[in-house]
C-alpha cells in the first residue's frame, strides 16, 4: 500500500505542475514569457473555450484535487458530482456562445441544436443544465427548491381562473368543497327555483319571441313529446306543449306535500283536464312526433311534482263532462303515483337519518383513527392468570389499603384536538422522508400516547426505526419509542410522551378488581399499561424476575411495589423473604418484619452463604416431595395436614444489586443463583434480581438463560437494552417508573408504568405488620464464620488446600485459572489459594514467564 500511495502522490504533483504551467500560458501567452508552446496553447485554449479559457484549467485542477482526496473515486456519489461539474461547464459554454459568440465548442453545439429547438429551446436547455448542476453539487432535494414556488403558482392560477369565470359568467359561483345533495342543499335549491318561477311570472312574455323548439337549428329532441290530436290521452304519457299559455292566473305557492294530506285539493284528473282546455291547438308544423315511451317508475315522483307546479295556474273555464272509463284510469294512475311518492319519501327520510356526520376531509388521514381503550394482547395475558376467592388467614390480619394515601387522579390524556395535531405533524414529517402511510389506531394513557402507523407496501420498516430522533424533534418530545414491527400486526407503534404525566399510585392498583380477585399468593402489582388499565402478573408463572435500570429510572420504586404487593397477599407463615442489599439502604425500611427468614444481608460474603443455604433448602424440599410422591409445592401443602408435616412457605430471594455481588463473589455467586433458577420453581423458591448495570459480565449467559422473565426500566445504551431484553427500546424510556416487561409465553414487550408508594406509606405498612407478630429468624440460614467460604486459608489442614496440592501434583499445572476450573471456585479464591501455597513453600514465586514451579511433594 505504501508504494501505491507514493505513486499516486507523484502523479498528482506532475499533473498539478502541468496544469499550473498551462494556466500561466493561458494568462500570459501573448507576453512571450512561456515560449512558443505557451503562446500556441493559449491561442488554442481561447479558440475552443473563449473567455472561459482563463478559468477552465484552475477549475479542472480543483476537481482533480477533490478526486485525489477521495479514497474510492468510482463510487456513485463521486460520479454524480463529476456529472454536476460537467453540466455546469457545458451550460457556461452554451451561455457564452449564445451571448458573446465565443468558443468553438459552444458555437458548434449551438449551431447543431438551433434548427431543432430554436433560440428559446437553447435558453431553456441552458437553464435546465444550470439547475440540475446546482442541485447535484449542493445536494438539495428538488422538493425543497420547487415545491414552495409550485404551490404559490398553482394558487395564483386558480385565483385568476375563478376571476375570469366570474367576469365572463354572471351566474358562476365557486363550488364549495364537501358533500352535495344534503337535505339543506335540496331545500335551498327548491327555494331558488321557486323564486325564479315567480320572476318569470312577473315579466310579460314577448309574443314575437320564439321558443327554442320553434327554431329549426335550436330544436332539441324530447323523448316525452307526443302528438296532440283529437284522440284520447294515453295512459302513462306526459303531454308537453311548445306554446306557453297567454292567459293564466297566479295562485299562492303551495307545499309540494299538501296533495298527500289535504283532501280539499282538486284531484289530478281535474288539473289535467283544465290544463288541456287552456292550451291552444298546435299546428302540425310545431309538433314533433315521437314514439311513445312508458314512464320509468323512478321518474314518476319527479314528473308528478312538475305537473303540480304547472297545474297551479288554472284558467276560469267551465268543466267538461268526462268519460267514466277515463276517470277510473286516471284514479288508478293517481293512486299509484301517490304510493310511489310516499315510498320515495320514506326512503329519503331513512337515508337522511342514517347519514353519518361528515367533517371536512383533511389531507393527512383518509379515515379518523380509532381510539382504543383496552389492549387485546394485554387482556389475553391477564386472562391467563388464576382468579378466585382467597382464604383469609385466621390469626393474622392482612394490611388494608387505608394505610396508603388517598388517590388524587388528574386526567393527563390528550384531547382529540391535540391528538389530531400530533397525527398531522407525524404524517407530514414522515412524508418528508418519503414514508407514506396512515394512522389507524391511537392509545392514550397516563404517560404516553401510542399511534399505530400502517406504512405503504413499498416502505421498509428499517427506515422508520431510524427516525426516532427526527420525530422527537418535530413533536417537541423528550424521547420517542418506535416498535417496529408489532408482532401479529401490519403496523408500526410510535409512542409519544404526553405533555403532562400522571402519577400512578400503588393504592389504585391494589384496590383494582384484578388484584382483589387474583387467587395466586404471589401476585405482583406491576402498574398500568399504556391505556391506563391496571396490570398484574403471577410470580409462580414467571417464575423468576430479572430487573435492570439506571439511577433515577424508577427501579427501586418498582421493586418496592412488588414487595408490598406480596405483603398484602401473604401472612408470615405462608411467605418468607431473603433480602440481599449490598447498598445497605434500599431494604433497611423492611428490617425485622416477620416475613424475613434472615436479617437483611448487606455483606456480599454472607450473601453467597445465604444463597448456598437456599440451594440446600431446595434440595431438602425436593427430597421430602419425592418421599410423598408429589411434584409441586401446592400438592405437597394440600397433603401436609393428612401426612402430619408442616407446609412449605414460599421462599423468595430479593437481590437489589447483582453487579456488586458478581464483582465480589464471581462464580461463587453465579452458580447458586443459576441452580435456584433452574430447579426452584416446583419447590416454591423464586428469585427477584435487580441490577443497575446490565452488562455481559454481570448478567452472564447462565443467569440470563435461567431468568426468562425480565423487566427493564430506562438504561443508558442500546447495548444494555439488548443484554436485558434481547432488543433495543429500553434506552428510550422516560424514567420515573416507565418500564418494559417480557411476560412468559408472550410475543413482544409490554410497556407499563410502575406504581409509586412513598416512604411514609411503606413505614405505615411495616409498622402494621410488626405490631401483629415478631420476627423469628431461621438458624440454619445464619451461617457462622467457620461455615463461610474461605477467602484466605491460613492453616495447613484445610481440605481445599490439600485438594489443590493433589490436583497440582497430578496434572503438573500451577496456574490460577487451572485451579479455578478444577476446584470449581471463583478466580479470587483460586488466586488466594495459590498465594497461600507459595507462602507455605509448596510453589515458587513467578518467574520471568509468569509460571510457578513445584518445590515439594506430600
From Swiss-Prot:
Protein's gene: ftsK
Stretches assigned to the FtsK domain: 532-722
Assigned keywords, A-Z: ATP-binding, Cell cycle, Cell division, Cell inner membrane, Cell membrane, Chromosome partition, DNA-binding, Membrane, Nucleotide-binding, Transmembrane, Transmembrane helix
Keyword Cell division: yes
GO BP terms, alphabetized: cell division; chromosome segregation
Membrane topology of the entry: Multi-pass membrane protein
Protein name (record): DNA translocase FtsK
Record note on quaternary structure: Homohexamer. Forms a ring that surrounds DNA.
Ranges annotated as biased composition (Basic and acidic residues): 186-213, 269-282
Task performed by this protein: Essential cell division protein that coordinates cell division and chromosome segregation. The N-terminus is involved in assembly of the cell-division machinery. The C-terminus functions as a DNA motor that moves dsDNA in an ATP-dependent manner towards the dif recombination site, which is located within the replication terminus region. Translocation stops specifically at Xer-dif sites, where FtsK interacts with the Xer recombinase, allowing activation of chromosome unlinking by recombination. FtsK orienting polar sequences (KOPS) guide the direction of DNA translocation.
Swiss-Prot/TrEMBL domain comment: Consists of an N-terminal domain, which is sufficient for the localization to the septal ring and is required for cell division, followed by a linker domain, and a C-terminal domain, which forms the translocation motor involved in chromosome segregation. The C-terminal domain can be further subdivided into alpha, beta and gamma subdomains. The alpha and beta subdomains multimerise to produce a hexameric ring, contain the nucleotide binding motif and form the DNA pump.
MF terms in GO: ATP binding; DNA binding; DNA translocase activity
Residue ranges, annotated region (Disordered): 175-218, 236-330
Amino acid at each position: 500500500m505504501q508504494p501505491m500511495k507514493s505513486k499516486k502522490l507523484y502523479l498528482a504533483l506532475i499533473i498539478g505542475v502541468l496544469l499550473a504551467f498551462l494556466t500561466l500560458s493561458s494568462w500570459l501567452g501573448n507576453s512571450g514569457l512561456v515560449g512558443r508552446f505557451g503562446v500556441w496553447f493559449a491561442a488554442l485554449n481561447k479558440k475552443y473555450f473563449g473567455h472561459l479559457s482563463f478559468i477552465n484549467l484552475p477549475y479542472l485542477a480543483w476537481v482533480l484535487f477533490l478526486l485525489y482526496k477521495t479514497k474510492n473515486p468510482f463510487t456513485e456519489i463521486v460520479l454524480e458530482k463529476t456529472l454536476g461539474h460537467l453540466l455546469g461547464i457545458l451550460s457556461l459554454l452554451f451561455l457564452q456562445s449564445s451571448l458573446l459568440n465565443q468558443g468553438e465548442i459552444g458555437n458548434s453545439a449551438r449551431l447543431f441544436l438551433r434548427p431543432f429547438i430554436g433560440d428559446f429551446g437553447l435558453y431553456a436547455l441552458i437553464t435546465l443544465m444550470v439547475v440540475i448542476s446546482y442541485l447535484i453539487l449542493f445536494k438539495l432535494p428538488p422538493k425543497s427548491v420547487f415545491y414552495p414556488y409550485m404551490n404559490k403558482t398553482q394558487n395564483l392560477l386558480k385565483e385568476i381562473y375563478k376571476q375570469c369565470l366570474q367576469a365572463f359568467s354572471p351566474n358562476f359561483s365557486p363550488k364549495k368543497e364537501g358533500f352535495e345533495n344534503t337535505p339543506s342543499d335540496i331545500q335551498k335549491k327548491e327555494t331558488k327555483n321557486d323564486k325564479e318561477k315567480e320572476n318569470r311570472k312577473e315579466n310579460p312574455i314577448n309574443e314575437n319571441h320564439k321558443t327554442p323548439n320553434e327554431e329549426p337549428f335550436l330544436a332539441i329532441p324530447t323523448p316525452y313529446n307526443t302528438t296532440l290530436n283529437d284522440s284520447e290521452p294515453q295512459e302513462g304519457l306526459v303531454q308537453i306543449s311548445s306554446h306557453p299559455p297567454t292567459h293564466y292566473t297566479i295562485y299562492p305557492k303551495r307545499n309540494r306535500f299538501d296533495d298527500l294530506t289535504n283532501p280539499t285539493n282538486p284531484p289530478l284528473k281535474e288539473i289535467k283536464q283544465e290544463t288541456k282546455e287552456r292550451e291552444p291547438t298546435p299546428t302540425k308544423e310545431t309538433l314533433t312526433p315521437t314514439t311513445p315511451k312508458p314512464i320509468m317508475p323512478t321518474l314518476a315522483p319527479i314528473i308528478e311534482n312538475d305537473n303540480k307546479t304547472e297545474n297551479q295556474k288554472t284558467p276560469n273555464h267551465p268543466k267538461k263532462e268526462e268519460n267514466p272509463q277515463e276517470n277510473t284510469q286516471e284514479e288508478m294512475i293517481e293512486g299509484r303515483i301517490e304510493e310511489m311518492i310516499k315510498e320515495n319519501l320514506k326512503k329519503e327520510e331513512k337515508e337522511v337519518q342514517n347519514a353519518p356526520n361528515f367533517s371536512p376531509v383533511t389531507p393527512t388521514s383518509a379515515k379518523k383513527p380509532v381510539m382504543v381503550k383496552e389492549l387485546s394482547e394485554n387482556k389475553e395475558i391477564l386472562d391467563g392468570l388464576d382468579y378466585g376467592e382467597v382464604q383469609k388467614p385466621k390469626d393474622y390480619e392482612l394490611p388494608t389499603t387505608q394505610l396508603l394515601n388517598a388517590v388524587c387522579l388528574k386526567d393527563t390524556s390528550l384531547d382529540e384536538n391535540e391528538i389530531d395535531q400530533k397525527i398531522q405533524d407525524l404524517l407530514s414529517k414522515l412524508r418528508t422522508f418519503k414514508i407514506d402511510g396512515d394512522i389507524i389506531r391511537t392509545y392514550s394513557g397516563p404517560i404516553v400516547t401510542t399511534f399505530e402507523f400502517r406504512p405503504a407496501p413499498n416502505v421498509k420498516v428499517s427506515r422508520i426505526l431510524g427516525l426516532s430522533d427526527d420525530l422527537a424533534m418535530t413533536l417537541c418530545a423528550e424521547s420517542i419509542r418506535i416498535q417496529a414491527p408489532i408482532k401479529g400486526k401490519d403496523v408500526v407503534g410510535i409512542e409519544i410522551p404526553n405533555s403532562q404525566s400522571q402519577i400512578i399510585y400503588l393504592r389504585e392498583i391494589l384496590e383494582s378488581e384484578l388484584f382483589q380477585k387474583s387467587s395466586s399468593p404471589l401476585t405482583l402489582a406491576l402498574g398500568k399499561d399504556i391505556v391506563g388499565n391496571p396490570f398484574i402478573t403471577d410470580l409462580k408463572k414467571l417464575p423468576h424476575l430479572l430487573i435492570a435500570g439506571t439511577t433515577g429510572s424508577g427501579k427501586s420504586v418498582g421493586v418496592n411495589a412488588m414487595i408490598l404487593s406480596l405483603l398484602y397477599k401473604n401472612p408470615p407463615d405462608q411467605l418468607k423473604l431473603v433480602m440481599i442489599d449490598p447498598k445497605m439502604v434500599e431494604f433497611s425500611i423492611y428490617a425485622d418484619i416477620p416475613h424475613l427468614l434472615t436479617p437483611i444481608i448487606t455483606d456480599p460474603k454472607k450473601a453467597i452463604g445465604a444463597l448456598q443455604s437456599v440451594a440446600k433448602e431446595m434440595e431438602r424440599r425436593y427430597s421430602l416431595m419425592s418421599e410423598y410422591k408429589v411434584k409441586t409445592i401446592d400438592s405437597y401443602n394440600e397433603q401436609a395436614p393428612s401426612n402430619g408435616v408442616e407446609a412449605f412457605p414460599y421462599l423468595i430471594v430479593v437481590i437489589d444489586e447483582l453487579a456488586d455481588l458478581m464483582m465480589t463473589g464471581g462464580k461463587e455467586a453465579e452458580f447458586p443463583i443459576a441452580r435456584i433458577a433452574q430447579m426452584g420453581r416446583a419447590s416454591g423458591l423464586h428469585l427477584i434480581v435487580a441490577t443497575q448495570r446490565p452488562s455481559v459480565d454481570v448478567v452472564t449467559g447462565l443467569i440470563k438463560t435461567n431468568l426468562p422473565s425480565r423487566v427493564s426500566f430506562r438504561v443508558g445504551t442500546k447495548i444494555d437494552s439488548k443484554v436485558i431484553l434481547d432488543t433495543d427500546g429500553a434506552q428510550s424510556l422516560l424514567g420515573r417508573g416507565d418500564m418494559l416487561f417480557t411476560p412468559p409465553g408472550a410475543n413482544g414487550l409490554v410497556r407499563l408504568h410502575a406504581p409509586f408508594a412513598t416512604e411514609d406509606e411503606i413505614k405505615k405498612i411495616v409498622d402494621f405488620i410488626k405490631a401483629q407478630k415478631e420476627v423469628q429468624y431461621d438458624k440454619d440460614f445464619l451461617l457462622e464464620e467457620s461455615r463461610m467460604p474461605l477467602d484466605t486459608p491460613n492453616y495447613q489442614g484445610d481440605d481445599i488446600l490439600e485438594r489443590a496440592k493433589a490436583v497440582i501434583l497430578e496434572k503438573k499445572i500451577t496456574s490460577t485459572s487451572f485451579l479455578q476450573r478444577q476446584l470449581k471456585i471463583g478466580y479470587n479464591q483460586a488466586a488466594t489459594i495459590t498465594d497461600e501455597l507459595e507462602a507455605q513453600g509448596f510453589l515458587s514465586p513467578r518467574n520471568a514467564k509468569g509460571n510457578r514451579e513445584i518445590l515439594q511433594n506430600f
